[in-house]
């Protein structure tokens, strides 16, 4: 799975936002979603395999946190996509005016 496919999934993006500034246990992350723990665990595995989150063990708990360096190469691509969408929005607004 390429990097864009990894971050294209809405729940994975939400997980990245949750662990952007702090470590969270897998159970704490799962508690914030309306899907099963195994489903969230699978998303965490995809993020970990892509290198977007780091995981460390604390006893029996796994703590997850974003690896910002790994997300760095995505930034220019995401900014381009964002700017294209904003340009389209501006064009639509101008057409309506």
Question: What residues fall within each predicted segment?
Answer:
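Conserved active-site alpha-helix within GNAT-family acetyltransferase domains
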Residues: 44-45, 74
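Amphipathic alpha-helical dimerization/coiled-coil segments
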Residues: 17, 21, 72-97
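N-terminal helix-turn-helix DNA-binding core of bacterial DNA-binding proteins
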Residues: 2-36, 62-72
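Beta-hairpin "wing" of winged helix-turn-helix
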Residues: 48-59, 65
């Amino acid at each position: 799975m390429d990097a864009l496919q990894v971050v294209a999934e809405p729940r994975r993006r939400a997980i990245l936002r949750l662990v952007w500034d702090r470590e969270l246990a897998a159970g704490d992350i799962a508690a914030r979603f309306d899907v099963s723990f195994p489903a969230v665990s699978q998303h965490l595995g995809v993020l970990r395999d892509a290198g977007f989150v780091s995981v460390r063990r604390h006893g029996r708990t796994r703590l997850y946190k974003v690896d910002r360096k790994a997300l760095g190469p995505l930034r220019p691509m995401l900014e381009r996509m964002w700017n294209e969408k904003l340009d389209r929005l501006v064009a639509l607004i101008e057409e309506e005016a």
